[in-house]
């Protein structure tokens, strides 16, 4: 995926969950942050971010990448489905409603949910970085679909150079427990890693290993 309209900024203050004041060309402007995570290791005063201009929006700018350990990480979850669409069949339908939940893709009796992972520690990708009731409910739904004989998948987009993955049992033990339960009951997980070179977000291979106890 190519990005040609990125503007470098410096974080001034995170006003709330979705609004950040940034310094752009010596002027403080408001930028929308489209990511439900805490992002404490990325969104803090003085750190570098890359934004895109968004006409017709309240803030005018949208944060797309944030710097962490000399590497820019994608932090715009609004792009996740677009990225994931390169890895699913063109026959898949997006945003499919099942009961009172929505899943990102459905291909006949195969259902796929997409999650973006920005947090990594010592080469281990960790999700989530904040408690996620929505993520937990998605896993429960996919587990039920798997037990009904349908294909149930979670596609994790890993925006770091991590070499393994684990659910974040410290931050969200409920999600972590359900992750292993869903895995045991037929939900399939895929972990695709991406890197950014300043212009292109590139697929850089799959993570094939788990870190820690698989609770099997």
Swiss-Prot record:
Protein origin, superkingdom: Archaea
Family annotation (InterPro entries): SfsA (IPR005224), SfsA_C (IPR040452), SfsA_N (IPR041465)
Covalent S-S links between cysteines: none
Gene Ontology MF term list: DNA binding
Entry's family note: Belongs to the SfsA family.
Matching PANTHER family: SUGAR FERMENTATION STIMULATION PROTEIN A
Name the record gives this protein: Sugar fermentation stimulation protein homolog
Classification lineage: Archaea, Methanobacteriati, Thermoplasmatota, Thermoplasmata, Thermoplasmatales
